[in-house]
Amino acid sequence: MASNVEDTLIKLDRLHSVDYKNDEVQLIKSKIEGIVHQISNRIGELNPILSNSVVHCGSFYHNSKINAPDEFDFLLVLNKFSQPGVCSCKPFEDPEYTHLVSLGIDNTKLNWNPQSVLEWEEDAANKQTLLQATIDSEYRNAVCSCLATMSLPDGISLTTSQKSVRRRFEGGEEFLANFKFSGPALTLLLNWKGVYYPNLNISVDVTYVIAMRGLPSFCNLDKRLPSEHLIVKAGLCADASHELLYCRMLDDTWKQTCSVLENKIICFWFKENDASNVCYRLLKIIRNLVTPVNQLGEAFLKTYALKTLFLYECEQFPDSKFWRTDELSTHLLTIFQKLLSAIQNRFLPNYFNENQNALCYPLDSRPEDENEEGENKFISSVYEAMCKIIEDIISSLEKGLASEQTLKFYFEPGQKIVIKDPDIQDALEKEN
């Protein structure tokens, strides 16, 4: 039987999790998917070389979305470029960046001959760079052409983001009022007018990728897991693929990611036992309620760090019997203790690339002599506030386990700590 603390955690999850059985949630899902498939089809019609398949990704599609159905993630897999033998990879010239590769495209296998590239450029390396830049520019042109004429379903309209100011000064981004490009990603900013959600802003990320068979070069998942591990037995490593995302600022360089595999692994664990999903949602809920944010309301502790810790925990304890709703507080306590240790070390190994840090700035940084005083103060302030909050979370869970307190800490959270990011502040002042 669940204790008071477990009952409280289950109540907290129900209070903040998206109700997937809600008809309006399913209606929003259907309309968003319709928009994305319309974009996908239209891109292929406008430019057949960019014909693509839609892949659903992100928290909404493994039933771990919290608060509202306000974020959707999709990949557009470029079918022709993802065919075997069309694209080849070699390690990036700087070994420090193991997640980057240089791409070669055999355009003769595609019957693709963009005249502006092939007629005027003789150098093979430059030709490759231009070919890859052409993919990106033609994708953007197709998207803009599509959105200019696309009609939206009833109840949904284009809107602008409250974070528009930030988007305007982020490097490498182009803000276009109702949608923006960030590298290979398109973000649509939409608004839903419904009954349960009368005024819901929704962001939809649509990212074009090239799919490659096998695990990426930096990933040792298949080597670190024994053959009897559930992930291996389920064939998730043997049937794995990874994606390439175009890095526009680095010539022919592409970033290797494991978005589809990550999604499959998370869905696999959640299918084994729903208690693990509850635990993962609670990690995000507690983060949202009590951890520090910047002046735009964005958490310094990103979801990816929590996801990374959760995946490691599932890998270490794969038995579905381990994940029980009457032991939620114990699971949360363990994960937050590991999170505190990672933040104190300023390093959390990425789940798929253990040499890469899953913590983001400023949590991955230490004050340095060469930094400006304001930046060092900012890094120290975020670090100290984050450690203090996580220590409080750990203490509340320990007290809950010891005395079965009801964890009012999460139902009556105090005012959030807001720490101003000097980069954002400078840009805001320039805007004004």
Curated annotation (Swiss-Prot):
GO biological process, one term: innate immune response
Record SMART domains: Mab-21
Record EC number: 2.7.7.86
Transit peptide is among the record's keywords: no
Binding site for GTP: 205, 255-262
Broad enzyme group: transferase
Annotated residues for binding of Mg(2+): 71, 73, 205
Residues reported to bind ATP: 59, 71-73, 259-262, 284, 303-307
Cofactor section: Mg(2+); Mn(2+)
GO molecular function terms attached to this record: 2',3'-cyclic GMP-AMP synthase activity; ATP binding; GTP binding; metal ion binding
Keywords: ATP-binding, GTP-binding, Immunity, Innate immunity, Magnesium, Manganese, Metal-binding, Nucleotide-binding, Nucleotidyltransferase, Transferase
Entry keyword Protein biosynthesis: no
Recorded superkingdom: Eukaryota
Catalytic activity, as annotated: GTP + ATP = 2',3'-cGAMP + 2 diphosphate; GTP + ATP = pppGp(2'-5')A + diphosphate; pppGp(2'-5')A = 2',3'-cGAMP + diphosphate
Role description: Nucleotidyltransferase that catalyzes the formation of cyclic GMP-AMP (2',3'-cGAMP) from ATP and GTP and plays a key role in innate immunity. Directly binds some unknown ligand, activating the nucleotidyltransferase activity, leading to synthesis of 2',3'-cGAMP, a second messenger that binds to and activates Sting, thereby triggering the immune response via activation of the NF-kappa-B transcription factor.
Homology family: Belongs to the mab-21 family.
Protein name: Cyclic GMP-AMP synthase-like receptor
Primary gene name: cGLR
